[in-house]
């Protein structure tokens, strides 16, 4: 029944000649039923070249913590709508950033889906219209062939990110040494607060060297590694003389039972530079290593 209604979102545009009748209809939404539920609505009239319109929409549309800006859901009217309840914003592609007029003042988690290109020179300005970048604490970048320099540029506007998730890193056209010599690399390595990384792609030793130099405060890394590289990776990460890994305390390998067994054998054989403990999550295929 209507009295059990928990969520009510509405936005409609009405063309009219005489708006008197429309305004009278809208008054029905000022009744006690809506006020008790703290659902409020706004009606705005504006003119175009060919006709007059009324835009009627809910100003407190929902209490959801997450919102996905995808095709057909972005707010493309000329008025900004503020969504206070949302803490996690997911953006599907660059067009949704460019055309959207929603604003999420309390967002702390930002997910940029695979179709979002951070190479777009306008992406920072457009994101700032949607949410306060300095407030973001958890950032997910799911695009392929991610340029580390572009990622660093984006992170320079998000100094409070502590958890970073991404699934690729490409040095095509921009070598590892050039990246490390870039002033932006040195800046990010000094100011960032990132303590946790989740890397979904196959991780190489070169990737790890970059991660630990760029994010010197890392305490947790989740990665997937080719079987033949696992020993080299562990020896590098667990080496006590590796000052870049001095804060690292927990590793998570995305692996199957065979790889988990191989890593456990490595640890028991004492071929690694320090003693470790492990636990295998066979439900999620994750091996955790700590020391």
Protein language model regions, located:
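Eukaryote-biased activation of long, low-complexity terminal tails and linkers
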Residues: 1-291
């Amino acid at each position: 029944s209507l009295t059990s209604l928990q969520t009510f979102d509405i936005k409609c545009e009405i063309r009219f000649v005489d708006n008197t009748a429309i305004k009278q209809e809208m008054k029905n939404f000022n009744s006690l039923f809506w006020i008790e539920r703290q659902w409020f609505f706004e009606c705005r009239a504006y003119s175009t070249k060919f006709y007059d319109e009324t835009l009627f929409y809910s100003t407190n549309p929902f209490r959801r913590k997450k919102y996905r800006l995808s095709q057909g859901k972005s707010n493309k009217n000329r008025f900004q709508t503020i969504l206070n309840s949302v803490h996690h914003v997911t953006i599907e592609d660059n067009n949704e950033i460019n055309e959207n007029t929603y604003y999420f003042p309390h967002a702390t988690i930002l997910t940029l889906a695979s179709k979002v290109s951070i190479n777009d020179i306008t992406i920072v300005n457009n994101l700032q219209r949607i949410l306060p970048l300095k407030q973001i604490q958890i950032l997910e970048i799911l695009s392929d062939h991610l340029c580390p320099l572009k990622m660093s540029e984006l992170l320079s506007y998000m100094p409070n990110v502590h958890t970073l998730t991404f699934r690729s890193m490409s040095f095509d056209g921009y070598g590892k040494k050039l990246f490390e010599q870039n002033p932006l690399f040195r800046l990010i390595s000094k100011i960032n607060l990132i303590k946790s990384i989740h890397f979904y792609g196959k991780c190489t030793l070169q990737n790890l060297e970059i991660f630990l130099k760029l994010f010197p405060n890392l305490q947790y890394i989740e990665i997937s590694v080719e079987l033949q590289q696992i020993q080299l990776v562990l020896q590098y990460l667990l080496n006590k003389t590796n000052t870049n890994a001095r804060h690292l305390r927990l590793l998570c390998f995305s692996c199957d039972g065979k790889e988990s067994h191989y890593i456990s054998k490595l640890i028991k054989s004492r071929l690694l530079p320090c003693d470790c403990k492990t636990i295998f999550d066979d439900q999620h295929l994750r091996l955790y290593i700590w020391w």
